[in-house]
């Protein structure tokens, strides 16, 4: 109570008694009776990929064409002019992880953005933030693909899909690691492994460079995923 908060160059300089050496053009805000909080970080957001108000032209959050679409990146769907960004900022959200939707077992890469005005998503990207990988279990994938008459259509189908994808990713990572370990002379005789964008993302998870963000409903499903 009855304290002053002094900012300079976007950082908190002092809390308590106001400094006496601030410049004459310093902006003074009377916030008596209000609250000052740190910026809120939203770790699960679809702003920009599902703008509001929603229209089909800008609804780009789910690549619902296959259960495994780890090759897609949410940042390539972000519409920086989504009016929702401004409303979120008014509510105190200053950074957010933008994720694909939850239709697929593996929905694709998520990206961390600063909630700043920008013409492009590149101008919003949070420096050095790791990518996330959106995954979903339970009702969503089995509903989406069960209705299409394809798999998965059950929870056991979901689990089988995860296992198969991680097995492929492990083999892919091992194959590339084996090639990279070869000497220059040995590489002349070896066949360079093909690059696969889907498996490259999954291998990034196995290497610890990409962080899983899992959409789950039930505790037992969460335990199943931990077992995998």
Q: Where are the regions that the model predicts?
A:
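A short, polar/charged loop/turn motif at coil->beta-strand junctions and beta-hairpin connectors
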Residues: 22-23, 66-68, 206-208
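Glycine-rich nucleotide phosphate-binding loop and flanking beta-alpha elements
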Residues: 13, 19-20, 47, 104, ...
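Glycine-rich loops and low-complexity Gly/Arg-rich segments
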Residues: 12-14, 53-55, 65-67, 120-124, ...
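Metal-associated gating/positioning segment near the N- to mid-region
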Residues: 31-100, 105
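Conserved small/polar residues in nucleotide/adenosyl-binding loops
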Residues: 226-228
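Histidine-rich, glycine-flanked metal-binding segment
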Residues: 1-37, 54
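Polyanionic/metal-chelating signatures
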Residues: 84, 89-223
